[in-house]
């Protein structure tokens, strides 16, 4: 999980965001983070429709000011902070 956090942190620093159609290790790391937080999301390294639905649901609950299904810095930072606040973290 630490590797996933480092990968995502680097992506945030680079100003990256993730949307449907994106693939690769950073998407895989983000999927692992959503799964760790409790979302039923397979880790496939592909930002597909299912991942888009998870991101949208997450935003609807935790960031209702902007619900667009794009995993931007605000979405990723919120997820990271919520994971850090989990018991035992």
Ranges and model annotations:
Residues 1-89:
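Cell-envelope/ECM-targeting effectors and their regulatory/trafficking segments
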């Amino acid at each position: 999980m630490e590797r996933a956090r480092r990968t995502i942190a680097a992506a945030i620093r680079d100003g990256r965001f993730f949307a449907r159609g994106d693939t690769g290790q950073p998407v895989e790391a983000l999927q692992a983070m959503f799964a760790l937080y409790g979302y039923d999301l397979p880790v496939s390294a592909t930002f597909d429709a299912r991942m888009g639905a998870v991101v949208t649901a997450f935003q609807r609950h935790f960031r209702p000011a902007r619900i667009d299904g794009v995993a931007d810095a605000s979405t990723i930072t919120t997820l990271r902070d919520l994971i850090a606040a989990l018991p035992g973290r």
